[in-house]
Amino acid sequence: MFINGEWINRKDIEVKNPYNNEIIGYIPSLSRNETKEAIKIAEEHKSTMKNLSPTIRYNILMKIASELSKNKRELAKLITIDVGKPIKQSIIEVDRTITTFKFSAFYSRELRGETIPFDDGMVITKREPVGLVGAITPFNFPLNLFAHKIAPAIAMGNSIVAHPSSKAPMITIELTKIIEKVLKSKKIPLGVFNLLTGEGHIVGDEIVKNNKINKLSFTGSVEVGESITKKAGFKKITLELGGNNPMIILKDANINKAVESCMSGKFLNSGQVCISVGRVLIEQEVADEFINKIVEKVKKLKIGNPLDEDTNISSLISLDSAERVEKLINKSIGQGGKLICGGKRENSIIYPTILEITADNILANIEIFAPVLPIIRVNDMNEALNQANNSNYGLHSGVFTQDINKALYFADNLEYGGVLINNSPTFRIDNMPFGGIKHSGLGREGIKYAIDEMSEIKTIIVNTK
């Protein structure tokens, strides 16, 4: 952990490579009192960040992006052994992280207010930093989702305490070393950024509850997100939570395109993506064609060591996660689900699995977070819409059709934060608004939108008469 410019290197928690279970490092586990002290230090540095000019913040962010670019391959390898993500996907994550910092740099110089005239003068608005941002991040995109919180916070001029998942903290430690180097080069006090490692029920809980935190940004499970809403008090919160994202395929769709999109949308990071395809809702007339084509492609996926360049599917984040998914597959089959391919577990690897199910099956109503694709046949577009909306989740959805009127109808009527037309739900560019409704979250990320969430509007009234 990194607090006020000091590294603390206790070996409290083992960090293991989920693919082979080898120990790759250790991290300290902060106590609640240590967490409180770190938050106090970060609070004392709020004015330091606020007083940095937009140009200095821009230069900090661009320099971080530059340092990341120098070591892309090494950083990608660390993501892979940290998470079990195939190396070619880890390289993409590093590239996206660089872009996230560059976008944040751009927006750091685009902070704008308004002028509103009235008879005796004018109203001026300006955006000011909220103060101290607490960032809690997940394991599945341990570098880019970390960047999606800290980069906008820096752009807006906030101090930061960041708590990465204890399942995949090693890459955030490397990023923190880069941030330390950049801050030192700019002669900025290091207490503006603090990395707090440890157990979520201690470190994360204190960040959530502590009144010195002005803004909390959390990515993780619905269960923890719901708990946060009850504990956070009056601080601003952004929650990026789970999803059971429907991919709707109508009978006029380009089936080949739908298959390709579903392959990338379902099996990226072995299905451990919050916007992964959760279920396919497909009209009867084209269901057989789609199933036959996607099964053919799934059987060609390379399963194995995530460091191999041609690997497509590797381990889940832990053996416990894989065993949970195995039980879900078996329960689905017990409820009448038809296993089309896969269904096999080998240690922490779940082989790519396709099942045909009905709407009352367990897999139709939960976030699976694994390379498991449930397919549900529907009679028409209205049934597809109703089934898609019959969910507590509301993150992303996808619709495949060649009829613009149908596409716009679904765009208007799907109860989701994002609607993708002729694309799977698993699409995100790093400067678009991103987030869900219902139990899938509160607020929006995406650099400009995260900056808005991490700022306050100050209104200045000038009487000129």
UniProtKB/Swiss-Prot annotation:
It is an enzyme of class 1 (oxidoreductase). Its EC number is 1.2.1.22. The keyword NAD applies. It catalyses: (S)-lactaldehyde + NAD(+) + H2O = (S)-lactate + NADH + 2 H(+). NAD(+) binds at G220, S221, V222, E223, V224, G225. Keywords: NAD, Oxidoreductase. The active site is at E240, C274. Transmembrane segments: none annotated. Coiled coil: none annotated. Pathway: Cofactor biosynthesis; coenzyme F420 biosynthesis. It comes from the Archaea. GO terms for molecular function: lactaldehyde dehydrogenase (NAD+) activity. PROSITE patterns: ALDEHYDE_DEHYDR_GLU. Gene3D superfamilies: Aldehyde Dehydrogenase, Chain A, domain 1, Aldehyde Dehydrogenase, Chain A, domain 2. Pfam families: Aldedh (PF00171). Belongs to the aldehyde dehydrogenase family. Involved in F420 biosynthesis through the oxidation of lactaldehyde to lactate. Homotetramer. This is Lactaldehyde dehydrogenase.
